[in-house]
């Protein structure tokens, strides 16, 4: 069975994000993944990434509205906005069906 495409994985990631499910979203990451939101320090490891999302979901209701998802080889690029107009983009490096690296940029309010 072929591995999931980076674009499809990010589509599923967005669905989990919009449900606010930190455990589910953590399952998309490799054990040693790095998530670097550029306004913050990089978060390393699936457990730490799960904790980051759990804290974020507990502190604010967040919704990711997809503008575009592009795929190039092992990479997927997500352009998004939220209901209040915040905009950003995320770069997801996917290997063997798991996110190994993610970098996010957004308009910091």
Where are these regions (language model features)?
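Short, low-complexity N-terminal intrinsically disordered segments enriched in polar/charged residues
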Residues: 1-23, 27, 31
